[in-house]
Amino acid sequence: FVGATGAGKSSILNLIGRYFDIQKGEILIDGVNIKDIDTDVLRAAIGQVQQDVFIFTGDIKSNISLDNENISIEDVKRAAEIVHADSFIEKMPGGYDAPVTERGSTLSAGQRQLLSFARTLAYDPTILVLDEATANIDTETEALITSALAKLMEGRTTIMVAHRLST
């Protein structure tokens, strides 16, 4: 979806995740009305990368895996490699065990966004939602993400939200 601020792009995403009830019409996923899908099941299928990234106190590894025991260190490293976050992670003292402060204050905006992409990819959702995911990052990081998008979207329903068609 592309549109100006206030056009309803984020509202559509909230409808897809069933955070709001649909008043008219229906939204189908693989031909199934989302009202017929258990809310927890639906939301578990959606991986979202937003404009504003939340980074947790801990380490790089836990910020990608969110300490989910089903996500191995190999999954974390594979996800980081696909989104090109591995290049900065491996340069950090401690690599994937490098400490991260609250909100990732020691990381650049681009590095935080790459971690968010890696986090979503490690989770392996069937539906990928990119909500202004490249809006506040530098052109170099945007180029890294753009080069990884084909792999990120492979085998997934992907919904992209942007203010400009170029993003």
Predicted segments with their positions:
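ABC-type nucleotide-binding domain
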Residues: F1-T167
